Design a protein with these regions (language model features):
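Internal mixed-charge
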Residues: 52-148
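Acidic, divalent-cation-chelating loop motifs in proteins
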Residues: 150-152
Length: 182
């Protein structure tokens, strides 16, 4: 599904409750988690609660990208003045971001409520590890490809906006030889 936007058209979440239920509906059908206790009175139903978790996951994912060395290199900024990623500038691979958000919601918020951490072979503990691994794989893939962010905000991702890296030429001296690294 496409990103969730507010009335102004700004992205507020990469996924919604239907995306989460589509991937892991057994947890909800088997009623393994008493969500009436988990959801605060501020939410009218389970879908609103899950939508709120999806919004939290987007914030955490954007922060993880911002904290990566990839973002520092991509923006050319130092650690003290890093700009935030703008979710409205993500123009490609939106389904990958939706999947990554669902994996994050499941591994961090929903499955830990049902998991029995005392039993290592617990199905829910195994699922947490599974979704955690899938999340990390997708995160690393998005960093490696880096063809999804519209840096200049013109509505398209052009070749010049894709990740470029620069290496400084330096000399390294060993005992018997000199190596030039580019």
């Amino acid at each position: 599904m496409a990103f969730v936007t507010n009335a102004s058209g700004n992205v507020i979440a990469f996924s919604d409750s239907f995306d989460v239920r589509d991937i892991e509906q057994r947890v909800f059908e088997a009623n393994e988690i008493n969500f009436t206790d988990a959801a605060s009175p501020a939410f009218n139903n389970l879908n609103e609660y899950i939508d709120n978790l999806c919004e939290k996951s987007m914030a955490r994912i954007l922060l993880k990208f911002k904290a990566s060395s990839w973002w520092r290199t991509y923006t050319g900024s130092g650690p003290s003045n890093l700009p935030d990623l703008d979710p409205d500038k993500i123009k490609a691979r939106q389904q990958d971001f939706t999947d990554m958000s669902v994996f994050y919601v499941l591994k961090e918020y929903i499955l830990p409520k049902a998991a029995d951490f005392g039993i290592e072979e617990s199905a829910e503990v195994a699922k947490i590890k599974y979704y955690s691994d899938k999340f990390e794989d997708m995160f690393q893939e998005l960093i490696a490809v880096a063809d999804w962010y519209d840096k200049d905000g013109d509505g398209t991702v052009q070749e010049g906006e894709e990740m470029t890296t620069f290496r400084m030429t330096r000399r390294t001296r060993g005992k018997k030889f000199v190596t030039r690294i580019r």
